[in-house]
Amino acid sequence: MARTVNCVHLNKEADGLDFQLYPGDLGKRIFDNISKEAWGLWQKKQTMLINEKKLNMMNVDDRKFLEAQMTSFLFEGKDVEIEGFVPEKDQD
């Protein structure tokens, strides 16, 4: 049976992550409060941020910046701003 969490990002009950993907207290908070769906949304934003801003994950400042963006996105409901990105419009 899948583990469910009350996802604070999506504001609904949803399937939880299978295991803690991020280290430390923040990782525990993500594991306990973020769903697989919300984590997937973050991963897409994270990839776009790394590419757009040419972040180097070996650089401590870049990792801190990305972690701050992740916390804002997952727990504070703030969208990640990516220069030049225009989301596709739904075509009905």
Swiss-Prot record:
GO terms for molecular function: iron ion binding. GO terms for biological process: cellular response to oxidative stress. It holds the Pfam family Iron_traffic. The keyword Iron applies. InterPro entries: Fe_traffick_prot_YggX (IPR007457), Fe_traffick_prot_YggX_sf (IPR036766). GO terms for cellular component: cytosol. It comes from the Bacteria. Keywords: Iron. Belongs to the Fe(2+)-trafficking protein family. PANTHER family: FE(2+)-TRAFFICKING PROTEIN-RELATED (PTHR36965:SF1). Could be a mediator in iron transactions between iron acquisition and iron-requiring processes, such as synthesis and/or repair of Fe-S clusters in biosynthetic enzymes. This is Probable Fe(2+)-trafficking protein. It comes from Shewanella oneidensis (strain ATCC 700550 / JCM 31522 / CIP 106686 / LMG 19005 / NCIMB 14063 / MR-1).
